[in-house]
Amino acid sequence: LTQKRHRNAHAGSERPAEPLTPAEAAALLAAASRASWSGIRDRAMITVLYRSGLRISELLGLRLADLDTAARTLRLRHTKSGRPQMRGYHPGADDALELWLQLRRPMGPGPLFCTRAGGPVWPQQVRATLARLAGRAGIAKAVRPHGLRHTLAVELLRAGEDIAVISKILGHSSIATTARYLDHLTNSAALTRLAAADLPPLE
């Protein structure tokens, strides 16, 4: 699944980052401390990225009021299309998010993920955190926010989810974008299915 980053021939399309294996994703999250304020925030932040498929700009644009834990929805004010969207997240993010909210809610309105002073977290801080945790977890590949988005897409496809549904989850403007995004896996799946297909015998 290793992919080299390169210029995409399709203008404006996303370039898939290298996805993590399930073991790597688990190790990355385990590397975040559950005993410190920043560790609890970082673990929740990374878990939501991983289990929602949000872009980093979408995640950091969230306000506390944009989160509905009962419905597991996130109201996005800042999206690539420029239009507000409602997106969801997997129940696997519940525990890490609830632990963070116990610290976050008493601070009042503001960014969902913030500094101790209540200010915004910047993309470069998230990238640095991912690099630090990846090193601590012994992950050799470069771990970036977009890689977590790609990891979710890969896991959904392998779980048998339809590309049209994955496209909606990721907030892609078209299914064609998602198809290019997962092209390496859909090609492999097509070959596997062809080899296993129950076709009429040739006489």
Name what the model sees in each region:
Residues 1-203:
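Conserved catalytic core of the tyrosine transesterase superfamily
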